[in-house]
Regions:
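N-terminal topogenic module of multi-pass integral membrane proteins
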Residues: 1-51
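Select subsegments of transmembrane alpha-helices in polytopic membrane proteins
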Residues: 7-12, 63-74, 129-140
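Helix-coil boundary and interhelical linker segments in multi-pass alpha-helical membrane proteins
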Residues: 23-35, 80-95, 148-160
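Hydrophobic/aromatic-rich structural module bridging two neighboring secondary-structure elements via a short loop
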Residues: 36-72
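Generic alpha-helical transmembrane segments
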Residues: 38-45, 72-76, 94-113, 168-173
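Membrane-helix boundary/juxtamembrane motif in polytopic membrane proteins
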Residues: 96, 114-139, 187-191
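Alpha-helical transmembrane segments in multipass membrane proteins, preferentially the mid-helix core
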Residues: 104-121, 141-148, 176-180
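C-terminal transmembrane-bundle signature of multipass membrane proteins
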Residues: 138-192
């Protein structure tokens, strides 16, 4: 099994675990934010599974992933609306926040580096996987920000709402544009 496949299997497993975690915690706390994130991670898991399952049908994978990233911007818009109107975040212990920050920043750093490297590649599978990773990492940064703004003092309620709306909207646009880019870009080879 090559390194890329092992990495995709690991991220698929973590997406499924995150989806179950957010679903159970969302049901337990009655948090629409967590339930919406659970739906996001379940759909992302399906997309990663389809990429693994149908990797020989690259044209299908590009189109499917492009449309799914565009559709994933819908629950992301829901999370932004929820964070503005109802659920501005949960206060967490400083150690948990440091761990979340380390995880989110590592995730976004690797996603950006791998996306830049994949841009030179003609492999549709590789570019598709990197687009999925960047969308996933962007959501992690948004979730981190939501928790940090309420866990650490210094910002007023209005400022928190503005920050959540701004970054959340940017994450929605990123997911949408990553999907649209896959649909419009025909430069990738149809062989891996």
């Amino acid at each position: 099994m090559d390194r890329t496949l092992k990495f995709v299997l690991a991220t698929l497993t973590s997406n499924i675990a995150f989806a179950i975690y957010h679903l159970l915690l969302g049901l337990y706390t009655s948090s629409w934010w967590l339930l919406t994130l659970a739906s996001y991670y379940f759909v992302l898991s399906i997309v990663r599974y389809v990429v693994l399952r149908y990797k020989s049908k690259e044209d299908f994978i590009i189109r499917f992933t492009g449309w799914m990233l565009i559709l994933l911007s819908v629950p992301l818009v829901g999370t932004v609306i929820l964070s503005v109107l109802r659920d501005r975040g949960h206060e967490l212990h400083m150690i948990v926040m440091i761990a979340m920050a380390a995880y989110a920043f590592t995730k976004i750093t690797f996603a950006i580096i791998k996306l830049i490297k994949a841009r030179r590649s003609k492999s549709a599978i590789l570019v598709t996987l990197r687009n999925i990773s960047l969308a996933d990492a962007s959501v992690s940064i948004f979730a981190l920000q939501r928790s940090m703004l309420v866990s650490f003092e210094g910002m007023r309620e209005t400022e928190i709402v503005i920050m959540n709306a701004a970054l959340g909207s940017a994450v929605c646009v990123i997911a949408f544009l990553l999907g649209a880019n896959l649909l419009r870009n025909k430069k990738y080879s149809l062989t891996n």
